[in-house]
Amino acid sequence: MGTGVGQTRAEIAQARRVVVKVGSSSLTTPQGGLDHERIRDLTDVLAERRKAGTEVVLVSSGAVAAGMAPLGLTQRPRDLATQQAAASVGQGLLLARYTAEFARHSLTAAQILLTADDLMRRAQYRNAQRAMSRLLEIGAVPIVNENDTVATHEIRFGDNDRLAALVAHLLRADVLVLLTDVDALYDGNPSLPTSTRITQVNGPEDLVGVDLGSANKRGVGTGGMITKVESARIATEAGVATVLTSAANARAALRGDPVGTFFVPAKHRRPSSRQLWLAHATAGRGSVFLDPGAVHAVVTEKASLLPAGVIKVEGDFNAGDPVDLRDENGVLVARGLVNYDSAEIPDLMGRSTRWLARELGAEYSREIVHRDDLVVLRNGSTSDREAC
């Protein structure tokens, strides 16, 4: 666990491009409506940084919260349909507020709504990358949110923390700032005087034994401290320095002041956005078990998973779903997007692709999981294949 301010924290003030994520609890009143004063304070900070020459992207939650009051909801809805209804009402209200506040600084706000699928598919990924990059070039401030109205339970971020980390990767940002309602990561309950602020995290090993618990206090947002730390991990694996602190510390964090918790970025090759999503932002819909030869091929040789190496299937999933790849003892070794329904795989197990093509047709000679749709999990980190 780090005890001091890292050398790279001071470089935040010179960052060329920053992504700032703010959660619902930092934008709303105790009653759940939009807090215009908080939004104004945040836009003042971001406008100040933008005018200093830094490209700024804001990932903002709050659409569901903003839509609650107009729909007569007193508590955040738990079912997806009502969440989507609230988001469809609230997203326009949220953007209108940001547009008005940034206009005070002669800046233009631009709405970007993304789904996990947009960052999983190469063409959509590139389109999102080009659109946001162009907005930054012409001086606008992209405001990103998950497209809650069309996202599904199966393929969604569920909170904007992980979305922010993947956007930081997509845009090759220098810094990610995660703003929440606590001032830092602590080694215990932050409300207890015995808890100590963690000033710097150099790697996952620094958090072994730390009880992350939940930072949610008001029931407005969806992300707790666990998802924020996971998002910091995604970003730092992509080489993006990350600061976790409260919205009240936004200005200080962007100056590189020693506030909050600083997560030191990794220095290895950047993984692809798809690999980061598979490793960190989704759960397997089922499991495919591999024999030792297949484990070696997938993990060491970075090969695709072929039917011949499969020994068992568990769960109910469809082609295109993420699945966990496990060795014969059940140890998770990789995760990938499967090419077959779970009901189809038992008839393919142990067979060569040549036999399958001859007996069942060419459509059954495909890999179970193609190497381009697969991420090897080693001690919780992604493999070092080329970034997309």
UniProtKB/Swiss-Prot annotation:
Molecular function as annotated in GO:
ATP binding; glutamate 5-kinase activity; RNA binding
The entry marks the following residues as binding substrate, namely S61, D148, N160
Q: Which UniProt keywords apply?
A: Amino-acid biosynthesis, ATP-binding, Cytoplasm, Kinase, Nucleotide-binding, Proline biosynthesis, Transferase
Q: What is its EC number?
A: 2.7.2.11
Q: Name one GO biological process term.
A: L-proline biosynthetic process
Output the NCBIfam families linked to this UniProt entry.
proB
- Protein name listed in UniProt: Glutamate 5-kinase
